[in-house]
């Protein structure tokens, strides 16, 4: 993961992508989606077993990552894609995904 710099706003999102009609294994599709989002400037991400956590200075960067993921999965021949996106845009103070995790493990 790339190091974060201080900034005014941080948007954190939980994103998962699911190709439909491609069989039971989605690993290759998720891998291709991750390759696509790794190229998005200003985006940090953390892979978890059920979703990927995205972090950026603005929501538009997160949406670019979602779009890039869909394009990557389409390029592999998926005819239908379902995705889930949940965004937390905190405006009152700087909180990163690591801060949020640390605050509940103290």
Predicted features, each with a name:
Residues 2-106:
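Charge-rich, low-complexity N-terminal segments
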